[in-house]
Swiss-Prot record:
It holds the Pfam family RabGAP-TBC. The keyword ATP-binding does not apply. Residues 299-313 have a biased composition (Basic and acidic residues). May act as a GTPase-activating protein for Rab family protein(s). One of its GO terms (molecular function) is GTPase activator activity. This is TBC1 domain family member 5 homolog A. InterPro entries: Rab-GAP-TBC_dom, Rab-GAP_TBC_sf. Residues 314-324, 983-994, 1079-1089 have a biased composition (Polar residues). Residues 22-203, 217-324, 425-446, 823-872, 983-1015, 1054-1089 are annotated as: Disordered. Residues 374-729 form the Rab-GAP TBC domain. Residues 26-107, 127-203, 217-290, 431-441, 995-1015, 1054-1078 have a biased composition (Low complexity). Residues 163-214, 885-930 form a coiled coil.
């Protein structure tokens, strides 16, 4: 009988096996091992777990194998009786041999049963030569080969029970009973019988080789062939799930062969190893867990391969290497299509012109960055330099300043990047001279430059210290934006390390701290992108894969259509520049020609050779703003050192370390103030985070604020946010964006517990809609500031104003207010300089806003009596607005006196007449604008009095404010000091007439006052005449005369105020409600109408320079204004305002002289006072 019959008969244990497995499909799906019975006659339980080791099958008990009573349950009823008899005879005669023959192979069967049953038959067929007697006896009982083949496929039927879809395959295989070709593994094993037997039995020590043979023959080759013959789809389902676990089982089973072979007489071997049902259940559960993990891992690998394939398919380089079949040109070492290269260069030049409002003056248009610049722009670095103050607002200084900064960075590199190896070659002559001097003086040679020297002056010692610092920086650089090819380049990483190292050396108080690399990375990318054309396609990809939850179905791998169709070169290509034309030469007029073929000043500012230099100074400018968030102030003031000499240095170092370890109060305070503003717009979210959960704001917002959202949003979205943040103000606009981020995830935070809420805050959901985020941030800012105005709360954040137009004036720093010519006393000035808050107004158009156009107020020494009266009347918001408005006017006029001092200094420096003429034109219109605004305020007072005529307290308060504003207007329009300079007395406005008209107005009844106010003041501007400035002596005389007249006028006003109060009380009692509603649209004051004015006033002959009314003398001797002195008014702490716009950034050149810029004063006052034309 052939050897193959042994393997076939072994598989044909009983047809009862197949019937029982059909009856218990649930158990079959959980099979974990394959175990045959031990062959004893008295052992009625044969534990058999056939096939599918990846399923956790419970043990299937097949009873009474020695009996022939289960014939009705077999699938092949004709052969079942013979099979059972044969097995019984084998079990009686050759019990031990049967066990030995199946000892190792049964274990191997439980591993390989899922891969294909042909492998099992071959393994059992390998062992038939050793136990020849038992095999012959066993095979004699199995003369029916067809039955053996049926039993073989009965085992396959067991696999079919796992999935009912394989019934057809099972039936087809059973029909091929005599076809031994299907059993490829059996044929291979029979042909190589001698080799297998020799390796397996004659050489018992070489069991690892046997394992290799089994693995190669059965696992890799035979399993695939036989299993594919049965069903290909089933191979895909089960093959991948059993690679690791089954192979391990196979190795373990082979290791147990020696024991089974040496103890061939041990009939209880299988009983001890396979009859533990409790352990099988635990093992099956563990196997099921491993299989699920492997399945998920396999799905993930397939998914990643699919993603890579999509990237390759969608890559424009692979799909369309040369889209237009144009001529290829070589730029450096890279070949690119000529037409695409020309288009890129043309776009690069046009981008520079896109950010300016006027190309002749290079006036930048900040509205372009309201919602961020375009993603693919190449002028982002220039915009950032101007917005952060790296470049001034004056374009004529750009070339000179850029050359100076680039030379300065080269000096930093030479001083801080030390290499003793190179220094030895460069300074060889100097060292020889020093050695000669030392030999002449008979002194020993110094070992300062020895590599083992510990001296601070040693170059080697400094070199090793620098290496340690750079190594610390490199750890963070390697983790910066992983996955982006730009930051994985070694040359880019070296540049980032060098920039951060030089900064730490240049600013030892700040040094380098973790997070600075996140701030430098977007800056370096922007500067490099502005000067190079390279493959930055991965920056614009959107990957929303959730690695933690392994949610692949929400994965969105989408490129914008624009970037998908773009062509990208194989390597970086520098844009064409010609910096020789600008190298230290400066530019004429407008700061350089933008129409030159070499790219003009735009090409000079984006020179690829200096992108590292430019990146450093942008980073330095940004760190001057946010550097306070990286420093830690000492918890207590440092006492003076008690030691001197060499130990003093050690004392200073210990104090420095203590300062570094102190709590960073600045950034934490910023987080707390930001969170407190949340209660004005989202009180529910505020109370839930603070009271219900007790989450401290700095736990999550400190990382947002310190590194300016660098780790929250992807790089392409972060660049858009930074455009708007730099345009507005980093320290002022960034908190509003953080509040907006909290509001947008409100639904994900509410009703969450402490840990879940922190999880959402620490891993902020990524959003790609940056315009929506910025638009919401602008709205949040307006709502918060309106709420603070309503509750009369000092606003700590500035509000932007419209951009300047041609009407502008220069702005300077806030200087202490003088006591001689201002209305603020010394105590108020001292308090106002101690701290700063901000007054707020909302601009009508958010897009025309700029961060540096802010109003900063100083905290004063107390509030006025008017605001205190209004608090209990329910009208505090309205009265506070009126009070702040007219007091702001006083402060603006007060500021003129301080700027007059700078005007004198500028006149001494021989200012040109053209510049003075521009200031004259601007300030003439400004004075007209101030007068018109005062008139509108008075009109508002009258209108308010008419509507609240029955409210006596409010009526008196408004009336008092109206009188104060009237007195201010009198001082502006009344000029008694110019009488001596006027030849025509008819062309002046006497002060007495104004006083008389004021008294007559106050003495009339409210009804008469309304009827008299039938027309607004009429101010006629005459044509401009030649202007000559009065000398300083004349000005001093005029100021003295003006002060005397002011003293007289104040005495008269005090006497008349008492009469006014008495008359007002009588008027209010006699006034009827119906009379207060007449003529609502009339002018608010009668004393300035055409009847009371004797002559028309011309404001064309006034000169206003640096916030001061300056007396001038014209040929026609028209009306002129002198130094203004205003009545004392109590100033509230919220009303002192420092005017600052985007053009008022004070920049100091190398000599330390302040460089002031111009701004639109007219639009600024219009926005602040709330009056829009």
């Amino acid at each position: 009988m052939e050897d193959n019959d042994i393997s076939f008969s072994i598989f044909g244990n009983s047809d009862d096996i197949l019937d029982n497995t059909k009856k218990s499909k649930s158990n079959i799906n959980n099979s974990g091992s394959s175990i045959f019975g031990n062959g004893n006659e008295n052992n009625n339980n044969m534990n058999t777990n056939n096939n599918n080791s990846n399923q956790n099958n419970n043990d299937i008990n097949y009873n009474n194998n020695n009996n022939n009573n289960n014939n009705n349950n077999s699938n092949n009823s004709n052969n079942s009786n013979n099979n059972n008899n044969n097995i019984n005879n084998n079990n009686n005669r050759n019990n031990n041999n049967f066990n030995n023959n199946n000892n190792n192979n049964v274990n191997y069967f439980e591993q390989d049963v899922d891969f294909g049953e042909n492998a099992h038959s071959s393994n059992y067929g390998d062992n038939n030569n050793i136990f020849s007697d038992e095999s012959n006896n066993y095979n004699n009982n199995n003369n029916n080969n067809d039955y053996n083949n049926n039993n073989y496929y009965d085992n396959n039927n067991y696999n079919e029970n796992y999935n009912e879809n394989y019934n057809e395959n099972y039936n087809n295989n059973n029909n091929n009973n005599n076809n031994n070709n299907n059993n490829n593994n059996n044929n291979n094993n029979n042909n190589n019988n001698n080799n297998n037997n020799n390796n397996y039995y004659n050489e018992n020590n070489n069991q690892q080789q046997l394992q290799q043979n089994y693995s190669n023959n059965n696992y890799n080759n035979e399993y695939i062939n036989n299993f594919n013959n049965n069903d290909n789809s089933y191979n895909n389902n089960n093959n991948n799930n059993n690679n690791n676990s089954n192979f391990n089982n196979y190795n373990n089973n082979n290791n147990g062969y020696d024991n089974s072979y040496s103890n061939s007489n041990n009939n209880n071997y299988y009983d001890n190893s396979n009859n533990n049902s409790k352990n099988d259940n635990q093992y099956n559960q563990q196997q099921q867990y491993y299989q699920e993990e492997e399945q998920q891992q396999q799905q993930h690998e397939e998914f990643e391969k699919e993603i890579e394939q999509k990237e390759q398919d969608s890559s424009p380089i692979n799909v369309n290497r040369n889209p237009n079949n144009s001529v290829m040109i070589k730029i450096g070492e890279v070949e690119v299509p000529e037409d695409i290269y020309n288009q890129k260069v043309e776009k690069w030049r046009n981008d520079f012109n896109s950010i300016f409002r006027n190309l002749e003056t290079l006036e930048i248009d900040y509205t372009k960055a309201t919602f961020g610049l375009p993603k693919d722009t190449t002028v982002r670095s220039i915009f950032w330099r101007i917005a952060l103050g790296t470049l001034s607002k004056d374009p004529t200084t750009w070339v000179e300043r850029t050359n100076s900064s680039r030379k300065k960075y080269e000096t930093f590199k030479k001083n801080y990047i030390i290499n003793p190896r190179n220094s030895k070659d460069q300074d060889a002559d100097l060292q020889q001279q020093q050695q000669q001097q030392q030999q002449q003086q008979r002194k020993p040679v110094s070992l300062i430059d020895d590599p083992l020297s510990q001296s601070e002056d040693s170059l080697w010692n400094q070199f090793f210290d620098n290496e340690n610092a750079q190594r610390e920086i490199s750890h963070d650089i390697s983790r910066t934006y992983p996955g982006l090819g730009f930051f994985e380049r070694l040359d880019i990483q070296d540049i980032m390390i060098r920039i951060l190292f030089i900064f730490s050396k240049q600013y030892p108080k700040i040094k380098y701290l973790q997070g600075m690399n996140e701030i430098l990375a977007p800056i370096l990318y922007s500067v490099y992108n502005d000067s190079h054309w390279f493959n930055n396609r991965d920056v614009f990809s959107k990957k929303n894969y959730d690695k933690k939850n392994k949610q692949y179905e929400h994965f969105d791998f989408v490129f914008d259509q624009q970037y998908q169709q773009d062509y990208y070169p194989d390597g970086p290509i520098q844009y064409p520049t010609n910096s020789n034309n600008f190298n230290g030469a400066g530019s004429s007029g407008s700061g350089g020609s933008v129409s030159r073929k070499d790219g003009g000043i735009g090409a000079f500012l984006r020179d690829p050779q200096y992108f590292e230099h430019d990146s450093y100074f942008i980073f330095e400018s940004l760190m001057t703003i946010v550097g306070k968030w990286f420093t830690s102030p000492p918890s207590s003031p440092q006492p003076p050192p008690r030691v001197q000499g060499q130990f003093k240095k050690l004392y200073d170092l210990s104090e420095r370390d203590a300062s570094d370890q102190a709590v960073n109060i600045v950034v934490v305070d910023q987080c707390l103030r930001m969170f407190e503003d949340l209660k004005f717009i989202e009180p529910q979210l505020y109370s839930y985070l603070k009271q219900d959960l007790g989450i401290e704001p700095h736990l999550y917002s400190l990382r947002w604020i310190r590194i300016i959202l660098a780790q929250v949003f992807p790089l392409d979205s972060l660049l858009i946010l930074w455009d708007s943040i730099f345009k507005e103000s980093v320290t002022e606009f960034l908190p509003y964006i953080c509040l907006t981020m909290l509001i947008m995830i409100k639904d994900q935070i509410i009703e969450k517990d402490y840990s879940e809420c922190l999880q959402v805050l620490f891993h902020y959901p990524v959003t790609q809609d940056m315009p929506m985020l910025l638009n919401t941030a602008y709205s949040v800012r307006e709502k918060i500031q309106m709420a603070k105005q309503q509750y009369n709360i000092p606003i700590s954040t500035p509000v932007s104003t419209p951009l300047p137009t041609s009407l502008s004036r220069r702005s300077i720093k806030a200087y202490p207010v003088s006591t001689s010519s201002t209305i603020v006393n010394q105590s108020t000035t001292t308090n106002s300089s101690s701290s700063s808050t901000t007054t707020s107004t909302t601009s009508a158009n958010r897009g025309l806003s700029h961060s540096s156009q802010s109003y900063r107020s100083s905290s004063g020494s107390g509030s006025g009596s008017i605001s205190n009266q209004n608090k209990g009347n329910g009208q505090s918001g309205i009265f506070s607005s009126f009070t702040s408005t007219f007091k702001q006017i006083i402060n603006d006029l007060n500021e003129y006196n301080e700027e007059f001092q700078l005007a004198k200094e500028n006149e001494q420096l021989k200012q040109q007449k053209s510049k003075l003429q521009k200031e004259v034109d601007t300030l003439k219109e400004t004075q007209t604008h101030v007068i018109s605004r005062l008139e509108r305020i008075l009109f508002s007072f009258v209108d308010f009095k008419q509507k609240h005529i029955h409210d006596q307290d409010n009526f008196e308060s408004v009336d008092a404010m109206e009188k104060e504003v009237t007195s201010i207007l009198n001082e502006v329009l009344n000029s008694q000091t110019t009488i001596a300079n006027l030849n025509n007395s008819k062309n002046r406005l006497p002060n007495k007439s104004v006083q008389q008209s004021t008294i007559s107005q106050q003495s009339t009844t409210p009804q008469q006052s309304i009827t008299q106010q039938t027309s607004s003041p009429n101010i006629v501007l005459k044509q401009q005449q030649p202007i000559t400035v009065i000398s300083q002596q004349q000005q001093s005389q005029q100021q003295q005369s003006l002060q005397q007249e002011q003293q007289q006028s104040t005495q008269q006003q005090q006497s008349t105020q008492q009469e006014q109060q008495s008359t007002q009380q009588e008027q209010q009692q006699s006034t009827q409600p119906q009379q207060s509603q007449q003529n609502n649209d009339n002018s608010p004051f009668q004393q300035y109408n055409n009847d009371n004015r004797q002559e028309k006033i011309s404001l064309e002959d006034e000169v206003f320079f640096d916030n001061q009314f300056v007396s001038v003398q014209s040929t026609n001797k028209e009306f002129q204004l002198k130094t203004l002195s205003l009545p004392n008014v109590e100033i509230h702490e919220d009303d002192l305002v420092e005017v600052k716009t985007h053009d008022s950034t004070v920049d100091e050149d190398e000599d330390g002289n302040p460089i002031t810029e111009q701004y639109n004063y007219k639009q600024q006052l219009e926005a602040r006072w709330g009056f829009n034309k």
